[in-house]
Each structure stands twice: as C-alpha cells, then as structure tokens.
Amino acid sequence: FDQLDTALYQAEKMLKEGADIIDIGGESTRPGFAYVPAEEEIERTIPVIEGIRKRFDTVISIDTYKAETARAAIKAGASLVNDLWGLKRDDEIANVIAQAKVACCLMHNRTNTEYVHFMQDMKADLEESMELARKAGISKDQIILDPGVGFAKSVEQNLEAIGKVGELLEFGCPVLLATSRKSVIGKTLDLEVDQRLEG
C-alpha cells in the first residue's frame, strides 16, 4: 500500500462501520505536534480527498484552520470545513467557507486555559466564532458546533463539557462531539490509547 491506498482502505472500512463523515487532516492535532505549512497540508490531503470523492458517496470534511488548504480541499470535493480554532486563526477562512457555501464545524479552543466560569466562558468563545461566521456571510444552517473535548481543558472540564453538551443546542446548530481515543477517556477509564474506543 502507498499512503493513498491506505487512506482509501481506511475510508472504506469506516464507511462500512457506519461513518457519516470522513474527516481528512494534514496536520496532527495531538498535543506537541508541529505546525505544517498550507502547501504541505495540501500535498498530503488533496490526493486523498480526490480519491475518496471518486470512489465513495459520502461527506468529506477537511480538518484545517488555514484558508488556503480549505479552498483547495473544497475544490477537490470536501463539503465541510472542520476548524479546530473556530475561525479565529486565519482571517480569510470564514470568507472561503461563505463563498463556497459549504458547512463548517466550529470547535471550541483557546490558547489561554484560565476560565472564570467554565461553561459560560466556553459558550462565549463559541459565540465569538459564530459572530465571525455571521460577519463573513455564513448562515446558521451551515454551522456545526464542537465543544472541543481534549483542547484547552482539564480532565474535569472535559467531563463537564461532555455532560453538559446539550446546553450548546441553545445556539440552534447541530453539535458534534469528538471523544474517541482522547486522553480524558484514558484518564477516566484508565485505558491506554489503543483501548479507548469506548470514547
């Protein structure tokens, strides 16, 4: 297998297991991983997106916070932009999403982990992301919200975000919860990373 064959095999396996969305990323979001320039991210992701688009009828998501990567991925067949910085890292990405009229997943994240009232602060941060979307011309029906489990949160805060995830529905958008293999699952259930599929 080359990398493309491996990715296509994995996508097929996930779809057979019931996946609704195939999320493709060219930069690891795990703690401690290095920044990847947009050009390299594009080289890594576009062949995979094109390959999946040719073979499968499914929603393809591009996991990026970079406008240049999002633009190339949409052109290649992605219909969802999964931005782990909630439109706050690249000023142009909201415009790319608005112009293409694709869906976007706005994840909660922040560089500062000091919260006064955790849920209130998290919702205020997500509200800022939604305002950036609105200003760019992204309609509410294009938006999915993600509480960002595993990002800028303690174990206790992650568990609170999971337990109170229903509160995010007050924004009037669907909510996506990504917990599989995250460290909060490992710490809560005392499991190694390869045994965390309960997430």
Regions found by a protein language model. Give the residues of each.
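Conserved strand-turn element in the central/C-terminal portion of the radical SAM core barrel
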Residues: 143-152
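Catalytic domains of carbohydrate-active enzymes, especially glycoside hydrolases
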Residues: 9-25
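Active-site-adjacent loop and "lid" segments of alpha/beta metabolic enzymes
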Residues: 1-10, 29-51, 56-57, 64-67, ...
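Phosphate/pyrophosphate-binding loops at sites that engage ATP/ADP/AMP, CoA/4′-phosphopantetheine
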Residues: 15-16, 20, 127-142
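Residues at or immediately flanking beta-strands
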Residues: 59-61, 142-144
